[in-house]
């Protein structure tokens, strides 16, 4: 165990408990909290978006401006999430908007400028607040310029002389590609062509800037770290990840068992623990409540749940062609999610045709998400790619067996029943096709129908797995120390 206390600034575009659009927010809450439990000195900084609760009345701890960002004042407001201090950077010009990144599925045209400003302000505020971090931990493209600016501008100052940077890659699809002329306030981008960030003579990518300039890089699972070194897995940045291979770590995300625990979950009609009797009765009560809430007949058939963004990344396009064939069996499917309107329309049509077996809820509701995790027998994650994934970990905690494609963090966290029955925690397939998904669905259903006691054994084993953030935080600490 690494014992030396480090000061860490965790820089993210969102954090669960204040504002969230995806899994990054979960990590931005849970990892700093776990690091703090390990007696590290941690702060989190995010933009002060309009929709953060009570942001207007939050304490202002700094009012200043960026000297080289003309006429742009900003404030830092102090918030807290479960004991972790949050620095929220407020600048109405950039963050007083209805949404975080986009409106009506259209990204804000000045996102490059917005998050360049945020990255710069993150560094500018630190001497003024007298918080001197050993590690600045950036996340994804939004904060990719933090390691770049630290290296190119700020590290020449005594205050930052011993500060090191890390960047986490949660999803390399989104790179933050912008034209040089969209970033006019970053003089470094105009005094010379920046090889660390450039993708052409006219454009830079913020993610590449972070990857090439950070002292250490981590992917959110060991398999994803390997996938990033391929063109397919990195979505066009294989050369950069290969170049930085010696500094690339793969650390599997943890699970926030405070929020996802069937023994304490307030959303469940009956709580349960990892014993055969408790799990059987608890999951039965949760299944009945789930069926009632989504309008399906209350029966003891196998229930397959799915909670996701409706995108091809999540494998919805593998599921759609084979749903009707699979529904010919004695089972039910519940899908909860929002996203691509074309996929949503197709799911609505299918649920209308098979209303006794298939329910599609076009919404995200936290209570319903918990009920799907607890009341389903199987949880669908047939992802095209999945850097880490969290729902498969939540599912196991609730004795719901994940059915996954063997990629990224899904491969690292789920043991396939056919490959390793004694230590199985779910079912997996590899081929990215609807037919491969259908085959694994039939495998799971066959075991459910023919060997109920074996299903219960696997469910109980899955419930006993531990993906704690404390273990992950120990790995992050080791990576931080390796940066010096």
UniProtKB/Swiss-Prot annotation:
GO molecular function terms noted in the UniProt entry: alpha-1,4-glucan glucosyltransferase (ADP-glucose donor) activity; alpha-1,4-glucan glucosyltransferase (UDP-glucose donor) activity
Keyword Transferase set for record: yes
EC number per UniProt: 2.4.1.21
Entry keyword annotation includes Glycosyltransferase: yes
Annotated PANTHER family: ALPHA AMYLASE DOMAIN-CONTAINING PROTEIN, GRANULE-BOUND STARCH SYNTHASE 1, CHLOROPLASTIC/AMYLOPLASTIC
Family: Belongs to the glycosyltransferase 1 family. Bacterial/plant glycogen synthase subfamily.
UniProt-recorded name of the protein: Glycogen synthase
Organism from which the protein derives: Vibrio atlanticus (strain LGP32)
Gene that encodes it: glgA
């Amino acid at each position: 165990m690494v014992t030396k206390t480090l000061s860490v600034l965790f820089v993210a575009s969102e954090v669960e408990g204040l504002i969230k659009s995806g899994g990054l927010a979960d990590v931005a809450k849970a990892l700093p909290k776990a690091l703090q439990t390990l007696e590290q000195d941690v702060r989190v900084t995010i933009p002060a978006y309009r929709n953060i609760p009570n942001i207007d009345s939050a304490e202002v701890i700094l009012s200043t401006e960026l000297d080289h960002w003309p006429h742009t004042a900003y404030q830092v407001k102090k918030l807290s999430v479960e004991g972790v201090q949050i620095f929220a950077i407020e600048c109405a010009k950039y963050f007083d908007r209805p949404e975080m990144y986009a409106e009506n599925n259209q990204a804000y045209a000045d996102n490059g400028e917005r998050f360049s400003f945020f990255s710069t302000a993150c560094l500018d505020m630190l001497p003024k607040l007298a918080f001197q971090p050993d590690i600045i931990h950036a996340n994804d493209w939004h904060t990719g310029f933090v390691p770049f600016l630290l290296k190119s501008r700020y590290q020449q100052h005594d205050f930052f002389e011993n500060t090191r940077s890390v960047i986490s890659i949660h999803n390399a699809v989104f790179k933050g590609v912008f034209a040089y002329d969209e970033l006019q306030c970053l003089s470094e981008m105009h005094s010379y062509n920046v090889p660390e960030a450039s993708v052409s003579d006219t454009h830079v990518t913020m993610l590449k800037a972070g990857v090439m300039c950070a002292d250490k890089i981590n992917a959110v699972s060991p398999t994803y770290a390997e996938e990033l070194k391929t063109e397919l897995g990195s979505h066009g940045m294989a050369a950069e990840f290969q170049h930085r291979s010696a500094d690339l770590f793969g650390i599997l995300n943890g699970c926030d068992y405070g929020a996802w625990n069937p023994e304490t979950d307030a959303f469940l009609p009956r709580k349960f623990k990892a014993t055969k009797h408790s799990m059987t009765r608890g999951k039965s009560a949760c299944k009945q409540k789930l069926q009632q809430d989504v309008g399906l007949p209350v029966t003891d058939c196998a229930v397959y749940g799915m909670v996701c963004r409706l995108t091809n990344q999540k494998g919805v396009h593998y599921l759609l062609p084979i749903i009707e064939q699979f529904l010919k069996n004695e089972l039910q499917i519940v899908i909860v999610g929002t996203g691509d309107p074309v996929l949503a329309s197709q799911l609505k049509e299918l649920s209308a045709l098979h209303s006794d077996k298939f329910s599609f809820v076009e919404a995200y509701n936290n209570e319903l998400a918990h009920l799907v995790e607890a009341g389903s027998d199987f949880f669908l994650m047939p992802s095209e790619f999945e850097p880490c994934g969290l729902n498969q970990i939540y599912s196991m905690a609730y004795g719901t067996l994940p059915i996954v494609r063997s990629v990224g963090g899904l491969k690292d966290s789920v043991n396939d029943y056919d490959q390793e029955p004694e230590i199985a925690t779910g079912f997996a397939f590899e081929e990215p096709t609807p037919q491969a998904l259908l085959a694994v669905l039939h495998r799971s259903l066959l075991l459910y129908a023919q060997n109920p006691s074996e299903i219960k054994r696997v469910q109980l084993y899955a419930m006993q797995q531990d993906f704690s953030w404390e273990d992950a935080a120990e790995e992050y600490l080791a990576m931080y120390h390796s940066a010096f």
